[in-house]
Structure formats: C-alpha cells, structure tokens
Regions:
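Sec/Tat signal peptide C-region and signal peptidase I cleavage site
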Residues: 22-28
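Trp- and acidic/polar-enriched beta-sheet ligand-binding modules for extracellular glycan
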Residues: 29-53, 58, 103-107, 129-226
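Bacterial N-terminal signal peptides that target proteins for export
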Residues: 2-15
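Cleavable N-terminal signal peptides
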Residues: 15-16, 26
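Predominantly extracellular/luminal regions of secreted and cell-surface proteins
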Residues: 35-88
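A short beta-strand element within beta-rich, extracytoplasmic domains
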Residues: 118-129, 200
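Short beta-strands within extracellular/lumenal beta-sheet-rich domains
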Residues: 98-116
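Surface-exposed, low-complexity/disordered Ser/Thr/Gly/Pro/Asn-rich loops and linkers
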Residues: 79-104
C-alpha cells in the first residue's frame, strides 16, 4: 500500500493501516519501552519506573524543529515546547504541550541536528486527562546523504521512498487513556544509528470526537558522547 492511498483513508483508517503496513519494516533490534503514571504518581517531574525522566541538556534542545505537515492547535504551544526542557505542572495544560489542531488526524514534525550524530535514545512524554495522553507515531531517520533525499516529505509522500528509514512505530493506547505516558526507543546494540534528521509521523489516538490528538510535553534525543 502506498502512502498516497493510505492518505485517502479516514484518519483512523490511516493510523491503523500505517501501523500495520509499516511495522514489519522496523529494525528487529529496536526496543520500545512504554510506561504510564496515573494518580499521585503523575507529577511535574515525569518520573517513570521504566522510562528515563526528561532531560534538559539533550541533543533535541539544540536541534531545529519544524512542523512539516498539519497544523498545531492555537490553544496549545508551538513545536518549540517539544524541546525546551520545560514540563507541564499538571494534566491538561495546553500551552505547555504541542498538539495538532482539534479534529485533525495528526501530522509530521522534523528534527534537524545540523550534522550527523550518533543517536542512543529517543524519548517522548505526554500528559492529559483523556485520549490526549496515549502516543501514536511513526519514527523515521536519515543522514540526508541518499540520492533523491527529500527533507520535507508532504502528506502524500512516503518517507521511505525519499531517503528516510523507518526506525519503529509507537502505540501506547493499550496502556489506557489519561495520565502521563512515557516512551523510550533504544537499540539492543546501544546505538539507534548515525543520523542528521528525525521525522515524527504523529497520528490521532481516536476519531470518535475532535479530541484525539496527543498532548506532547517533551521529546528528548540522547546521543553518544564524544
């Protein structure tokens, strides 16, 4: 199935089709660790049992973050809140989170580190009282060196066809709605790869109403130290 045909499906259909079709191409050694805090365990420190707490001095903090596809909700923060090291103090704090426009099916966000770096971990964090807590996205990466590389794939372009590699898919909906969701993407061999760019293909968690877009509080990228 091509990306263009997926794009013609409904938002929920797109999410399911993309996850099912592309999951098979994810690297066999990739590990996706999912954790969730609810009740009193959900604090502004975002401390999880199995996922590292957010960091302030990570590679993402210095990256250029660009919204490629979709629109951010005007009630929330822009893409800069994903890497500013500042966390919401409570659930449902719109301006402290990035999320796509109400009723939309998601979109794409790119990180550019300026040069190739060795990436060890990609960690993402979200917090909401309902369907805006789970995380659903596809993570791609590229060093930008492949012939025909497209740094800005639009909604009808499959990143795999223009120099991007699918790293993995993330779907934390089985953990339940509400609370804090933490995700840590690692590799069994220690390094996810040497890349200049990361591309996040975010998908709405549900389409039963207009409130299915995740409140992303922070995304960290941990690189190998020189």
């Amino acid at each position: 199935m091509t990306f263009s045909s997926i794009a013609r499906l409904t938002n929920l259909g797109w999410a399911l089709a993309a996850l099912l079709v592309l999951a098979a191409s994810a690297h066999a050694q990739i590990r996706v660790t999912v954790d969730r805090n609810i009740g009193s365990a959900a604090t502004k420190e975002f401390k999880f049992k199995n996922v590292p707490a957010p960091a302030k001095e990570d590679a993402a903090a210095k990256a250029t973050v660009t919204l490629l596809v979709g629109e951010n909700d005007p009630a929330g923060g822009d893409v800069s809140v994903l890497t500013d090291g500042l966390l919401p103090a409570k659930a449902d704090e719109p301006k402290s989170n990035f999320y796509f426009a109400s009723g939309s099916g998601g979109g794409r966000v790119r990180m550019d580190f300026g040069s190739v770096v060795e990436i060890k971990q990609v960690n993402s964090y979200s917090w909401h009282t309902g369907a805006g807590a789970p995380q659903v996205y596809l993570l791609y990466a590229s060093d930008g060196a492949e012939i025909g590389f497209n740094a800005e794939p639009n909604a009808n372009t499959d990143p795999i066809d223009c120099g991007w590699k699918l790293i993995t898919t993330v779907d934390t909906r089985k953990s339940g709605d509400g609370g804090q969701h933490g995700v840590s993407i690692t590799d069994a061999h220690g390094i996810l790869g040497k890349y200049r760019y990361l591309l996040f293909g975010f998908v709405a968690t549900e389409t039963d109403d207009d409130a299915g877009n995740t409140f992303y509080s922070e995304i960290d990228v941990v690189t190998k130290k020189p």
